[in-house]
Amino acid sequence: MHTRTLVLGVVLATSFSGATALASADAATSHHTTRADRAGAYKVTAKVNKTDPLLNSKVKIKGAVSPGAPGAAVTLQVRYQDQKKWKTIDTARLNNASKYKFKDKVGSVRERKYRVIKAASANRSAGRSPALKVTVFGWRTLTSLTPATTAGVAEVDNATINGVTYPSSLRSVGLPSGSSIEYNINRDCKAFRGTAGLEDSSPSGGTGVVSLLADGFTKYSGGFGLAQAAPVYFEVPNVFRLTVNTTTTGGGIAAVGTPEVLCSF
């Protein structure tokens, strides 16, 4: 009797130890599998159609997620140059090919970055795209900037050239030669536009020459009599200083109607 009891105890102990070992092994295996499954993150690609869009236009951001997750949500985030935190601005669903697309209207002239986030799933860590830098450009009047230097050219509320009144303009004042006004645009602008001509209040025999320079290089020069005007446009990539020179004869008043620069500030 004693021998049978002892044998049974050994069998039970052995069975219990084996079951415990198996349970521990299963738990370890389960834990290991979960960690392994979540060790990989989703890969999110992204590209933007324009890196230098115009104010109030729309940029398009599109890309894909792998491994595929059709129907899953992805979010679009933005961070502006003067901010530290990312802000979620839109959500989309992945199509059958695990691709997505977003559109965003850029309503302010400043640099921003976009990124796309795919949240974690049961067996995959969250993924995010690289940040996409976008610099928005908008037209602004040159007279909204503070002149670096000025001599004989004034900023005026309006100038009338060939019967057309232009707001926020420039015109010569008194000096027949050597008149100029200069602005620093700090290599943050892409183009200049305006209308050059002779102000309508000039005497009949007056004339004027308007010259526009970018970092000392002449980009435009034109001579005008009364009721003469010409549209002016040129690019100013990587230009630090923009100069407007005027020369007049016979009491003429040279003018630039509504000069504007396309800038990212």
Regions picked out by a protein language model, each given a short descriptive name:
Residues 2-138:
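Low-complexity, Ser/Thr/Pro-rich intrinsically disordered linker/stalk segments at domain junctions
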Residues 130-265:
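Gly-Asp-aromatic-enriched flexible segments
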